[in-house]
């Protein structure tokens, strides 16, 4: 296989992906670098990216609006899966990577490129997600990974870029590395590399501090149909608008901040700061409506598989047979997950204060009550307990 001459680069506008453009041309002999930036709802951040790529030497600069598929095809399945990596991180950044990689491959096919490239470094998770996804979708395409191979320090990378007129967005005054999409923000590097250092308020952008959040609680109703959130406070919304509304409501009350130590795929621990107000709110509400509408054995099994689903996505296996099989289980489990969850937002907390399902609630008040309306047959308990505990009694008879 000869050297790739036409390459589509996953472009973010940051230092590494900007430096990749001249580096691919000079060091790899690539003749045409096509920069592709994904619009995932990050807003104004994309305004200057197109021209920035051209200034860095790209032959063409493309921006793809992926907000709708990002929310509908990636975020909403994660909500139905209650996806929390290591029980805490809702995959706000990880969910975007297979979508970007998929579009990278599609553009390469459309433009007859013979390679694709990314600017991920050798220490992060994203290199794994891009490489595994591209390998699964297009094993014939050449994959170029200059930032993993060039061996330059951060300072050397910046200096290399400056020779080509690339101005770094990070300075000593703003030393943080930030990734942003509609699901939230991830912040790392700088002072945050000390896991005992409290993050300053300046690192947060979409959640209020507790001090600045409202002094009165807010009650919010979230309606689910087949496990999908479809309305907030009685107002039906399409998925993108619903995520925006959930972000606004939860973020205003200071909910959705995470400060965690996370185990990366490559084997190292990292300190990560996340803001994911809407996604965490919706997952919490979804867990609650499931508790009302699903039987115990299905809940227990789904709980175990949810962690596996989150692990697969975090580790780059969105397009894998096991992930697809788990999707089938989760899709079936959501057929009766219908109803409304009521939450109270206040000072960084979300408390579930009510839940109801007109058609699918498994909570039967006549069976659960301790009042005079009680229809539970108490006499049946004795025989049930005898049979239920029989293995323990047999064990005791034989061994004690």
From Swiss-Prot:
Enzyme class per UniProt: ligase
One GO biological process term: argininosuccinate metabolic process
Residues annotated for ATP binding in this entry: 10-18, 38, 119
UniProt key word Cytoplasm: yes
An example Gene Ontology CC term for this record: cytoplasm
Catalytic activity reported: L-citrulline + L-aspartate + ATP = 2-(N(omega)-L-arginino)succinate + AMP + diphosphate + H(+)
Localization (cell): Cytoplasm
Pathway(s) where this gene product acts: Amino-acid biosynthesis; L-arginine biosynthesis; L-arginine from L-ornithine and carbamoyl phosphate: step 2/3
Quaternary structure, from the entry: Homotetramer.
Domain of life assignment: Bacteria
Entry's family note: Belongs to the argininosuccinate synthase family. Type 1 subfamily.
Binding site for L-citrulline: 89, 125, 129, 177, 186, 262, 274
SUPFAM superfamilies noted in UniProt: Adenine nucleotide alpha hydrolases-like (SSF52402), Argininosuccinate synthetase, C-terminal domain (SSF69864)
Binding site residues for L-aspartate: 121, 125-126
Database matches in NCBIfam families: argG, PRK00509.1
CDD domains named in the record: ASS
Pfam families: Arginosuc_syn_C, Arginosuc_synth
Gene Ontology molecular functions: argininosuccinate synthase activity; ATP binding
This protein's UniProt keywords: Amino-acid biosynthesis, Arginine biosynthesis, ATP-binding, Cytoplasm, Ligase, Nucleotide-binding
Keyword Cytoplasm set for record: yes
InterPro entries registered for this protein in UniProt: Arginosuc_syn_C, Arginosuc_syn_N, Arginosuc_synth, Arginosuc_synth_CS, Arginosuc_synth_type_1_subfam, AS_cat/multimer_dom_body, Rossmann-like_a/b/a_fold
Record-given protein name: Argininosuccinate synthase
EC number: 6.3.4.5
Primary subcellular site in the record, as a coarse category: cytoplasm
């Amino acid at each position: 296989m000869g050297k790739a001459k036409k390459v589509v680069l996953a472009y973010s506008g940051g230092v590494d992906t900007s430096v990749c453009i001249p580096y691919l041309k000079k060091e790899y002999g690539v003749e045409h670098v096509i920069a592709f930036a994904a619009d995932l709802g990050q807003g104004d951040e994309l305004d200057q990216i197109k021209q920035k790529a051209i200034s860095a030497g790209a032959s063409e600069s493309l921006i793809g609006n992926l907000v709708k598929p990002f929310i509908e095809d990636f975020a909403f399945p994660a909500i139905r899966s209650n996806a929390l990596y290591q029980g805490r991180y809702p995959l706000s950044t990880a969910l975007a990577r297979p979508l970007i990689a998929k579009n990278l491959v599609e553009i390469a096919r459309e433009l007859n490129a013979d390679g694709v490239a990314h600017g991920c470094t050798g220490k992060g998770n994203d290199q794994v997600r891009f490489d595994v996804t591209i390998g699964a979708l297009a094993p014939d395409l050449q994959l170029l990974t200059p930032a993993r191979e060039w061996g330059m320090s951060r300072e050397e990378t910046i200096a290399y870029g400056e020779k080509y007129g690339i101005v770094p967005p990070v300075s000593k005054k703003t030393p943080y590395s930030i990734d942003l999409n509609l699901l939230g923000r991830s912040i790392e590097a700088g002072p945050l590399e000390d896991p005992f250092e409290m993050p300053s308020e300046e690192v947060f952008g979409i959640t209020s501090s507790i001090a600045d959040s409202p002094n009165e609680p807010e009650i919010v109703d979230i309606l689910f149909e087949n496990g999908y959130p479809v309305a907030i406070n009685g107002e039906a919304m399409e998925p993108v608008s619903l995520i925006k509304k959930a972000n606004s409501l939860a973020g205003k009350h200071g909910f959705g901040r995470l400060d965690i130590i996370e185990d990366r795929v490559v084997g190292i621990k990292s300190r990560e700061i996340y803001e994911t107000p809407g996604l965490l709110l919706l997952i919490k509400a979804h867990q609650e409506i499931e508790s009302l509408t699903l039987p115990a054995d299905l809940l227990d099994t789904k709980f175990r598989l949810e962690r596996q689903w989150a692990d697969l996505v975090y580790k780059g296996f969105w397009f894998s047979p096991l992930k697809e099989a788990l999707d089938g289980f989760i899709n079936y489990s959501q057929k009766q997950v219908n109803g409304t969850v009521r939450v109270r937002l206040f000072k960084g907390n979300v408390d579930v204060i009510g839940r109801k399902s007109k058609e699918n609630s498994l909570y039967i008040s006549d069976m659960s009550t301790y009042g005079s309306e009680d229809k539970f047959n108490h006499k049946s308990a004795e025989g049930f307990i005898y049979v239920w505990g029989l293995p323990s009694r047999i064990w005791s008879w034989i061994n004690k």
